[in-house]
Curated annotation (Swiss-Prot):
The lineage of its organism: Bacteria, Pseudomonadati, Pseudomonadota, Alphaproteobacteria, Hyphomicrobiales. The keyword Ribonucleoprotein applies. This is Small ribosomal subunit protein uS4. It comes from the Bacteria. Keywords: Ribonucleoprotein, Ribosomal protein, RNA-binding, rRNA-binding. One of the primary rRNA binding proteins, it binds directly to 16S rRNA where it nucleates assembly of the body of the 30S subunit. With S5 and S12 plays an important role in translational accuracy.
């Protein structure tokens, strides 16, 4: 098991929130952070601390993206026209592993990254094994025919915990999906509040 997967429960406890909306999240049982000092009362957080927390939460949600890669998303978000926070969310939601997760082909962002890495996904008929691949609106995403009967796929498509968002058209009979448009922050079904503008402020310091 990778360190990223081992750390997901720790992130929930550190944030005191169920980041992925999972029934087995440790914060469903306790609301304090990890470690022996997790129950201490916390004082008011500084602006820097608030921005850092927003960054850790958003970065962690997408499978704990590396800092180097997340900085690249920030750089691209401020380069694009429009609201930089909205741009950041759009770039993250266009990741191939994010689309695979949103389409309910697998149950978690961590599983989505591994699923793509192992070559189970095609984009416009071509196998792509890069989780960060940027999907464009209209691209056809499909699970390889030989991978459609994998247990993780069958279980994920039957999950009732979350729905496929409106900006993705998913056909679980054919195991295909399309991103119909780049979503705004308000459209993304985050289980907790995400504050991408605070992330932009963090990197803009």
């Amino acid at each position: 098991m990778s360190k990223r997967i081992q750390a997901k429960h720790k992130l929930d406890r550190r944030m005191g929130q169920n980041i992925w909306g999972r029934p087995k999240s440790p914060v469903n049982r306790r609301e304090y952070g990890p470690g022996q000092h997790g129950q201490r009362r916390k004082g008011k957080m500084s602006d820097f601390g608030t921005q850092l927390r927003a960054k850790q939460k958003l970065k962690g949600y997408y499978g704990n993206i590396t800092e180097k890669q997340f900085r690249r998303y920030y750089a691209e978000a401020i380069r694009l026209r429009g609201d930089s926070g909205e741009n950041l969310v759009g770039l993250l939601e266009r990741r191939l592993d994010a689309v695979v997760y949103r389409a309910k082909f697998v149950a978690t962002p961590f599983a989505a990254r591994q699923f793509v890495n192992h070559g189970h996904v095609k984009v416009n008929g071509v196998r792509v094994n890069i989780p960060s691949y940027q999907v464009k609106a209209g691209d056809l995403i499909e699970v390889k025919e030989s991978s459609r009967q994998l247990e993780i796929v069958i279980v994920a498509t039957q999950l009732s915990e979350r729905d496929v968002p409106d900006y993705i058209e998913a056909d679980h009979a054919k195991m295909t999906a399309r991103v119909t448009r780049i979503p705004s922050l308000s459209e993304v079904p985050y289980p907790v509040q995400m504050e991408p503008n605070l992330v932009i402020e963090f990197y803009s310091r």
